[in-house]
């Protein structure tokens, strides 16, 4: 169990580190018009840290509940797809300065969280519930993304 927790912690930290390294929030972002309900910049780091920590815990619970290697492979594939989609959004929005492209990508990220919940629920109901904040935050971020696109389009 200690190895599983260590691996999950490493993956969460790697995702956080990669996301931070690939995100450059600069003058361009600060110049965008944003809705009055846009959270302050400092909220996003702690929010994602908690959400990805919960996702890591969900992965550990599901991994421990998995009865065989095939189930663990399925868990790993679901998380791998989610990680790729999670890491894709920030460069689209911030580095390429294309919130419109990020808006096209975000439904796939949201669906990958749904797939995680559906895939983990039969193994561990608590694991599935630990992913609920992730799903809600991505839905909120998608609506914020949509609003920013509407307030600032066109891009590119």
Where do the language-model regions lie?
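N-terminal signal-anchor transmembrane alpha helix
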Residues: 1-21
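Transmembrane alpha-helix/helix-exit interface in multi-pass inner-membrane proteins
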Residues: 17-24, 49, 61
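Cytosolic, membrane-interface loops and tails of multi-pass inner-membrane proteins
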Residues: 23-40, 149, 155
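Membrane-interface loop-to-helix entry segments
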Residues: 39-54, 98-109
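Helix-adjacent hinge/juxtasegments
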Residues: 53-90
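Membrane-interface helix caps and helix-loop-helix hairpins in membrane proteins
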Residues: 68-69, 91-100, 121-125
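Hydrophobic alpha-helical segments of small multi-pass membrane proteins
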Residues: 76-89, 103-116, 131-138
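Terminal transmembrane helical module of multi-pass membrane proteins
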Residues: 121-156
